[in-house]
């Protein structure tokens, strides 16, 4: 049986980390693509030279021509400009929208049957634009946001409670930005909801609110510390979890920026919601009940994403 083919479009810090993780997990043969000739080839060669030490069998190649991604089973898109200190994800919109147009055309021509995971910021608007530019089925184009945001939330909760990260489940809904909605009510430690843990004296509402805010600021905290770029280890690990769910038909329940067609009262937008990912791509959108406060926060997040999509249409009217 032929190996799967994974195309990594963008060979920066996330792209290189994706290639290494995909190799370690033996998810398939890997093509690193970047318009900056030499970088994908160099990173591909470097990671390939680690394979005898790490003990994985995968072909790693680099390319600067879209023809190299032909027939890819999965495309993970990180191409674009990352954040720098003082920038919001939204500040990147104009530059990265043009990148999505080129990437969409490349995928449409060479990998129309791929499952496409977008990481480029501002995420919810970029994945929406990428789907339109590529013309791929909406269930086969998804944004990586909720897995990362939930992972940050889970880590901070594990540190607060001094328990294993494995015993914490957490959900973050909404856009991948300052308006994201970490849901305490649907987040648990070994099945015990966070509100119950407050009553049990494990933490306080004030402390939990601080953790929720730190989750919202998770990316900005790292940007501020690095000063020259943004997070890449955790975003790459999050996208690989999604790719693996698709390639191995795992039916994983993962929060992702998925295309909504009426769910949660949202139409023709990509917003972070719980989904089931299997061989069919996004196989199901899970609609959970939101209370009044949660619904208001979610609607505020949706409105922020809608504003970004409108800004995209102003720049590229063909998206309408």
UniProtKB/Swiss-Prot annotation:
The active site is at 176 (proton acceptor). It comes from the Bacteria. It catalyses: (S)-malate + NAD(+) = oxaloacetate + NADH + H(+). The keyword Oxidoreductase applies. InterPro entries: L-lactate/malate_DH, Lactate/malate_DH_C, Lactate/malate_DH_N, Lactate_DH/Glyco_Ohase_4_C, Malate_DH_type3, NAD(P)-bd_dom_sf. Signal peptide: none annotated. It holds the Pfam family Ldh_1_C. NAD(+) binds at residues 10-15, 34, 96, 119-121. It is an enzyme of class 1 (oxidoreductase). GO terms for molecular function: L-lactate dehydrogenase activity; L-malate dehydrogenase (NAD+) activity. Substrate binds at residues 83, 89, 121, 152. GO terms for biological process: lactate metabolic process; tricarboxylic acid cycle. Keywords: NAD, Oxidoreductase, Tricarboxylic acid cycle. Its EC number is 1.1.1.37. HAMAP family: Malate_dehydrog_3. Catalyzes the reversible oxidation of malate to oxaloacetate. Belongs to the LDH/MDH superfamily. MDH type 3 family. This is Malate dehydrogenase. It comes from Rhizobium meliloti (strain 1021). The gene is mdh.
């Amino acid at each position: 049986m032929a190996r799967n083919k994974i195309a990594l479009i963008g060979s920066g810090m996330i792209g290189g980390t994706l290639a290494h993780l995909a190799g370690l997990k033996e998810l398939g043969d890997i093509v690193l693509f970047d318009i900056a000739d030499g970088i994908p080839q160099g990173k591909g060669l470097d990671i390939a030279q680690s394979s005898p030490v790490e003990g994985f069998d995968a072909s790693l190649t680099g390319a600067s021509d879209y023809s190299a991604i032909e027939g890819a089973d999965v495309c993970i898109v990180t191409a674009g400009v990352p954040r720098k200190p003082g920038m919001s994800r939204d500040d990147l919109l104009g530059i990265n929208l043009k990148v999505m147009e080129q990437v969409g055309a490349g995928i449409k021509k060479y990998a129309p049957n791929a499952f496409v995971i977008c990481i480029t910021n501002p995420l919810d608007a970029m994945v929406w634009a990428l789907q339109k530019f590529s013309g791929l089925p909406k269930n086969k184009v998804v944004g990586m946001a909720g897995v990362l945001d939930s992972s940050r939330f889970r880590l901070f909760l594990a540190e607060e409670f001094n328990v294993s990260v494995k015993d914490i489940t957490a959900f973050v809904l909404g856009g991948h930005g300052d308006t994201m909605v970490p849901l305490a009510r649907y987040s648990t430690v070994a099945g015990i909801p966070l509100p119950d843990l407050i009553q049990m004296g494990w933490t306080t509402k004030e402390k939990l609110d601080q953790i929720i805010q730190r989750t919202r600021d998770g990316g900005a905290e790292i940007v501020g510390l690095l000063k020259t770029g943004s997070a890449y280890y955790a975003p790459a690990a999050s996208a690989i979890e999604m790719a693996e769910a698709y390639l191995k038909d795992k039916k994983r329940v993962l929060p992702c920026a998925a295309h909504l067609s009426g769910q949660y009262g949202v139409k023709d937008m990509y917003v972070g919601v719980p989904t089931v990912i299997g061989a069919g791509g996004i196989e199901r959108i899970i609609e959970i009940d939101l209370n009044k406060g949660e619904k208001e926060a979610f609607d505020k997040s949706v409105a922020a994403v809608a504003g970004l999509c409108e800004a995209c249409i102003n720049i590229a009217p063909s998206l309408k």
